[in-house]
């Protein structure tokens, strides 16, 4: 796929765990786990874009440097287009909704749920 061909030499299914996230960012991946293979990278781009706040995403792009940030942006564009064309999902609208809901979570209630406390 087009996505897999962007940084094929940067994927390492064995040594990805030794990379820091910053090293992965500089290689054009949004997480060190995403640098393990293209399929994981694809999902990590989408998942992290949806759940991480703007400050995290902006910091990642800044720390990635010009080359890493350009690669991440290229990957994001592919993910965004794919979701829109294949699933009719507006990634920005989905992210906005997830971000809004995350702000309104009652963490105290969630942490007190019986299944989380092993009961």
Task: Name these PLM-found stretches.
Residues 1-119:
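Active-site-flanking segments in enzyme catalytic domains
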């Amino acid at each position: 796929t087009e996505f897999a061909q962007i940084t094929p030499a940067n994927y390492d299914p064995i040594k990805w765990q030794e990379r820091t996230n910053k090293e992965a960012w500089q290689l054009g991946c949004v997480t060190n786990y995403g640098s393990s293979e293209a399929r994981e990278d694809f999902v990590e781009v989408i998942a992290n874009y949806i759940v991480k706040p703007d400050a995290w995403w902006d910091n990642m792009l800044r720390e990635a440097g010009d080359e890493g940030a350009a690669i991440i942006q290229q990957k994001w564009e592919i993910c965004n287009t794919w979701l829109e064309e294949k699933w009719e999902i507006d990634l920005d609208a989905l992210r906005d909704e997830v971000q809004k809901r995350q702000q309104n979570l009652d963490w105290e209630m969630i942490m007190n749920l019986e299944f989380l406390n092993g009961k």
